[in-house]
Amino acid sequence: MSLRYKNGFLITPSGVKYSLLKVDDIVFVSLDGKFDETKNKPSSEWRFHKDIYSSNNEANAIVHAHSTHATAVSAHNKDVPAFHYMVALAGGNDLKCAKYATFGTQELSDNIINALKNRKACLMSNHGQVAFGDNLEQAFELAQEVENICHQYINAIKIGEPKILSSSEMDVILEKVKNYKKG
């Protein structure tokens, strides 16, 4: 996970369990990809965090997870259609799945940026998911929703092909979602 900070971002280090993290373990990475190499290395996924912050001013916090259901759905390398209106929380009428690339590579970052066009979350093929928000709480809540959506989708397709909401209905939902937290 990471948080936008000054001219870069703070990110969890590579190879340190979250339960053992200390403040001094957190790594600052500038938006040009520089970090203090005498300290902890940033997460191997720092590139896509950097590129998300650089390409989207609405991203102030990012959560990346290998959550069970999102990872299972991502293994099919398909977008999740609008089988449920909550798909709109990710920012569109489907939940995109970024094409597969090896973890930690620029290719993976490019694929994620492509999948996140007009979105706040996406699946990462054969990998997991990424979500962003105004703060860590929002990013984490969205990541939880993505996990829930994927769990529900797995259950829905076990029964058969789910009914997909129309584009016009999703347009209505997307407008409602924009104003949902505003009152």
Model-found features: residue ranges?
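Glycine-rich flexible loops
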Residues: M1-G183
